[in-house]
Amino acid sequence: KLKNAPKRWVPGEEIARTLLGLKGRSAFFIDTCHSGINARPGQSTNPDLTKALNEINEERGVIVFASSTGKELSQEDPAWGNGAFTKAIIEGIRGGADFRKDGLIRPSTLQSYVTDRVMELTKKEQRPVIFTVGIDEPIAVRGQ
C-alpha cells in the first residue's frame, strides 16, 4: 500500500513551516505511527521540526503530544473507536488527568495520564512522547 502513502504522509518540513507561522501558544496532538520527536539520545530527529519547535518554544511556548516514538507503531483497536493514544487523550481531558480535582487539565498531568494509559492499553508496546518546556498552565477544562 505504499503507492498511497504520500497522500497520507505529512513531511516534517511542512509541519515545521506551519508551526512557525502560528501566533500564540499552541498544543499539538499527533496520533500516527512513527510520530515521535525522538528526543532520546541516539535516536535521529527531523532537524526542521526540532528547530521549529525550539524556536516557537523560545518565543511563545508549544506543547507536542506524539502517540509513539519515531520507531514505534501507534496501535488501534476497533473496540476503542480510535488509536490507543487518542483514546487516552479523550479520557484524560474528560477527567482522567484531573489529578487535583480542580476541573483543570495541565500538560504535566495529561502527560502522566496519557503515558500510563497508552502503556496499559498496548501492553507497553507503545510509548507516547511529549515535548514541552516550562509550560504547565491549564490547557483544558475537564469535559463532561
Where do the model's predicted regions map?
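Cysteine endopeptidase catalytic domains of the caspase/legumain-like
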Residues: 1-144
